Amino acid sequence: MRPWFSSVARRLALGASLGVVALTVIPNLSCAARSVSVAETESLRRLELLRVEIARHDDLYFRKAQPEISDADYDALKQELRELESRFGRRVPRDPAALRDMGDDRVSGFPKARHRMRMLSLEKTTTESGVRAFDQALRRLVKPPAEIAYVVEPKFDGLAISATYEEGRLVRLVTRGNGEEGDDVTAAAGRIRTLPPRLAGAAWPRVVEVRGEVFLTFAEFERINRGRRENGRPTFSSPRNLAVGTLKSLEPEDREVRQLDVVFFGLGAIDGHAAPASQTQLLEWIAQWGLPSVEDARRVDSIDDAWRAVQELGGRRSHLAFPIDGAVIKLDDAVGQTAAGVSEVAPRWAIAFKYAPARVGTRVRGVALQVGRTGVITPVAELEPVALAGARITRATLHNASEMERSDLRVGDFVWIERMGEIIPAVVAVDTAQRGTVSAPFVFPRDCPGCGALLVRALDDANWRCTNDDCPARQVRKVEHYVSDEGVGIRGLGAASVEALVRSQRVREIPDLYTLTAAEVTAHTRLSAAQAARVVDAIQRSRKAPLRRVIAGLGLPGIGPAGANALGARFADLPQFAAARESDLQQVEGLRPESVRALATALSAERTQQLLARLAAAGVGAQSATADAGTLAGKEVVFTGTLPTLSRRRATELVEEAGGRVADRVTAATWRLVAGRNPASKLHQATALGVPVIEEAELLRLAEAAPE
């Protein structure tokens, strides 16, 4: 095995242990195996594992925005697959999808829209020789090659987006998807603070598709995480993941809470206007149209100057206000771009240079074990403090027991740390050459660190698990999840307060929250009387949370946000949901068979039934009564802009408590558009469709409610 690939190999082995990369026969691969020697059988198996693992990581990165490995490790997977496919030649059918440089970010729950012009990705390289090879190939395509100038731009680390403006008005916002069609996220345009609903001036095309990237600045990312830390909530892993999650959330978001940005640097279809003569002119036009453009672009006259610009930008990236993961080199001249043409997935006149992730070495002081709400035990390396990309790193995840065993990580080892996505610190390699003469493999304890119960681990499981449902550590995590924004959203009840309430045994399970008094909260936590009163008020309001949010907060097996939404739409209230059988769950659109089985098993458990019954008795999840009797029963409301006194979440709660529903898009079915400061394109859509527009005060009157 290649030494440089050891960390990737461990992850592949981990995937196999999880059952994710079980040996699934690729069409004709078993036949091909008959024509190879016994010595090549293992290589064939590895080739198959690589294809499955790459597909899994594509899904995690492009669709779920939850990458598990660094870009460098991902690129290494693809490189080894290329080498194996090359070695076997025609004896093994190739899998073009596994090696495509363009993923597919389309997910369920969004309408699809076709791009007027195909939206491409970029070829990538990580070496200077790759950059120079690109230059040589381009010179063979562009005649004459003497006048070749380049534009070097930052490679923003966000979500690729295409905005269509017709007659100067924003009419469509679409993700790249598979290049031909993407997810229509026009309804979320208001979440991007720098995206104008209208172009500036008048010298714009009749129709134009502008391409760019939606991202989150480091300052905004840190502001969001700082607030979550102060409230005891889990922090987000990276700006890119949060940007993708915010734009593609099916829940209405408060723009004051998560403020996205966008930058444009490319062009799709253009009608009623001459095409730009160069990339430089395009960037100038984008700025003249009032759109955010690339400010750090640099025009250079040679590949030598381009390489110097790439290196200089790399040296400044830790000081930039936004995340980048590379630099893009583009041929400036539009005529030359046309001559160079495009491949299946990328233009031949541009290339992205990916920067190596920041890496530092340090020693492992110890290994801490964290207990999750499902009982999974996660090992975390406690490190000698080290600076990495401007941050002080003291801890890094070790993923699970299987990964630790395969890496043979030991206390005292010298390890290499990288920041995945420039944010998440991860142990990527163990330097055994620096290991002391006296060391011992880490042995997982057999007792739960949270309750002392015996830990168990199935043969095919990568994790040790605590099976004690009454484990205080598990209960803390369960309650934390329930009160979080992913659940019913009880503001002011942070991790420290939840832990104090559970440790004091005043809160043993989630339903105990609904019997808390302000005096008890004050007695068992560090909250003041005023803070405790607000917490109890928030708890009482959460009784009216929609069923979908209650289900999401319970964290039932196999059910994520999308599944909770589907279940909330299917069942009238919590008792009806509790009574659901497997045959009922099979009728819920969007639930996978394995999720149905896991949920049916959970609902059949006496403990689950008791918990749901207690919640129902507390008046939780009784959405049908509210929906039938509310002043907004059956009415659809859409929000745009920032409201004067209500957060977007609270405004949504008011509508739902009054029996209405909140949508992200203005359609003919919209009852009212509630407009605040800085409204987005929804205001124009409402005017065009004849939808009445009201302000917050009118909403409060109609909902017969008052602001917080």
From Swiss-Prot:
Keywords from the named record: DNA damage, DNA repair, DNA replication, Ligase, Magnesium, Manganese, Metal-binding, NAD, Zinc
All copies of domain BRCT, residue ranges: 627-708
Catalytically driven reaction(s): NAD(+) + (deoxyribonucleotide)n-3'-hydroxyl + 5'-phospho-(deoxyribonucleotide)m = (deoxyribonucleotide)n+m + AMP + beta-nicotinamide D-nucleotide
PROSITE patterns xrefs: BRCT, DNA_LIGASE_N1, DNA_LIGASE_N2
A GO term, aspect molecular function: DNA ligase (NAD+) activity
Segments forming a coiled coil: none
InterPro entries in UniProt: BRCT_dom, BRCT_dom_sf, DNA_ligase, DNA_ligase_AS, DNA_ligase_CS, DNAligase_adenylation, DNAligase_N, NA-bd_OB-fold
A Pfam family this chain is assigned to: DNA_ligase_OB
UniProt similarity note: Belongs to the NAD-dependent DNA ligase family. LigA subfamily.
Function noted in UniProt: DNA ligase that catalyzes the formation of phosphodiester linkages between 5'-phosphoryl and 3'-hydroxyl groups in double-stranded DNA using NAD as a coenzyme and as the energy source for the reaction. It is essential for DNA replication and repair of damaged DNA.
Entry-linked NCBIfam families: dnlj (TIGR00575), PRK07956.1 (NF005932)
Protein name in the entry: DNA ligase 2
Species of the source: Opitutus terrae (strain DSM 11246 / JCM 15787 / PB90-1)
